[in-house]
Amino acid sequence: MAENGTISVEELKRLLEQWNLVIGFIFLAWIMLLQFAYSNRNRFLYIIKLVFLWLLWPVTLACFVLAAVYRINWVTGGIAIAMACIVGLMWLSYFVASFRLFARTRSMWSFNPETNILLNVPLRGTILTRPLMESELVIGAVIIRGHLRMAGHSLGRCDIKDLPKEITVATSRTLSYYKLGASQRVGTDSGFAAYNRYRIGNYKLNTDHSGSNDNIALLVQ
């Protein structure tokens, strides 16, 4: 350590040599999360990624608050206060949007920090909800050897004749309806179908699915 409290080049080089292995593992973990942590690929890594994203908000806010409290000068203190306010408002808007989406879908996927778009598929007497990165005009459904995949998500076993007549895509502000259009069976247990968006409005999902698959949304009054 130099006399003025700074770290010399040799000391910095020694620290890097000692911590190279740990730094390598940290970067490898980030690479795995960024490259493989998708909801339709590896659910375990995806959950870890979501936990990291959730923790980044309070940690970032705490860093700016501490930077404002223990400011170097008034300029850095002012910047830290401004950034703390911005991060706080962004975090608050995330919670507002998440609770609005939860009120619409009753799904814990509503608190996903990566996206606020949810696909809702009524299947086998229940509604399967999965996250989407964007809302499309057409959503494809593929059945391969009796297993249904929709928008990249595996939804379990299903025959093409048992596909729901209607699915929805929910955001914090709207609920979009998609109607089953063209469908084609391929072989005995495979096939494909397309759902076309035909209506959008301020609705909430009808989680009571004991009746018909056709009525899966209720108008928000």
Swiss-Prot record:
GO terms (molecular function) for this protein are:
structural constituent of virion
Its signal peptide is none
Per the record, GO CC terms? host cell Golgi membrane; membrane; viral envelope; virion membrane
Q: Give ranges for the Virion surface compartment.
A: 1-18, 71-78
- A Pfam family per the record: CoV_M
Q: Which domain of life is it from?
A: Viruses
Give membrane topology per the record. Answer: Multi-pass membrane protein
Membrane-spanning regions, if any? 19-39, 50-70, 79-99
**Keywords from the UniProt entry:** Glycoprotein, Host Golgi apparatus, Host membrane, Host-virus interaction, Membrane, Transmembrane, Transmembrane helix, Viral envelope protein, Viral immunoevasion, Viral matrix protein, Virion
Intravirion side, ranges = 40-49, 100-221
Where does this one sit in the cell? Answer: Virion membrane; Host Golgi apparatus membrane
Subunit text: Homomultimer. Interacts with envelope E protein in the budding compartment of the host cell, which is located between endoplasmic reticulum and the Golgi complex. Forms a complex with HE and S proteins. Interacts with nucleocapsid N protein. This interaction probably participates in RNA packaging into the virus.
Spell out the note in the miscellaneous section.
Answer: Bat coronavirus rp3 is highly similar to SARS-CoV (SARS-like).
Quote the function comment for this protein.
Component of the viral envelope that plays a central role in virus morphogenesis and assembly via its interactions with other viral proteins.
The record's comment on protein family reads: Belongs to the betacoronaviruses M protein family.
- The protein's name is Membrane protein
Question: Which organism does this sequence originate in?
Answer: Bat coronavirus Rp3/2004 (BtCoV/Rp3/2004)
